[in-house]
Amino acid sequence: MEIAIVQHDIVAESVERTLSGIESLLAGVEAVDLVVLPEMFATGFDVDDASVAEPASGGGVRRWMQSLAAARRSAVEGSVAVDDNGLRNRHYFVCPDGTYRYYDKRHLFSFGGENRLYRQGVSPCVVEYKGVRLLLQTCYDLRFPVFSRNCGGCYDVAVYVASWPKSRISAWDTLLQARAIENLAYVVAVNRVGTVGKLEYDGHSRVVDYLGRTVTGVAD
C-alpha cells in the first residue's frame, strides 16, 4: 500500500484556505492508495469553540474529503469536529466511492479541556482497505497502549492523526516506536505544523515498521 502523509499548517478561521493549501500540497503527489491528514486538519484543535463542528449528517469538510477521494481515487482519512448528539472528534476513513467509516476519539485530552466540550467515543475501529487492516487512532490515544493492543493480529497498521505540540514531541517519537514494537504492526502517524497562540507544532510525521524503525518521515 502506498500512503501519502500530509503534514501541514492550518490557516486560522479559514477552512477554505486551509483545504486549498492541502490540495496544493497534494498537486505534485503521484497516485497513492491512502492520503492521511492530521487531527482536526481543517479547523485546528479548538476545544473551546463549538462553532467549528459540522453536522454529522454531512458537513462541508466531510464532503471535501469525499470529493478529494473521488478525484484522486485514493482513500482519505483525518479527523473533523462534528456534532452528533454532542460534539465528537471524529476520525473519518473515506473511500473513493464516497462511502466512509469513522472512529470517535476515545481518550480526550483533559489537560487541554477537550473533555469539557467533546464526548468520548466507545469502540475502536479497524478498516480493511485493499487487503490491509488499519486501526484508526487519534492523538492522545497514543498514550494508552491497552487501547491499541493487537490481540490476535487483528490489524496490520495503526494510523494516528494528531495535533501534538512541540513541547512534548520527544514523547510522540518514543511512543510511536513503542506502539509499533509491542504490537508487531506498522504505525502511520501524521501531526500538524504551525503556531497557535503559545503552542507550537513541529510535525515529526512518520511511518514506523514493526521493529520500531522509521521507514520515512518529515521533521518540521
Feature map (PLM): residue ranges:
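Short beta->alpha transition motifs characteristic of CBS
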Residues: T43, A50, Y92, Y103-F109, ...
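CN hydrolase (nitrilase-like) catalytic-core segments centered on the catalytic cysteine
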Residues: G60-S74, R143-D220
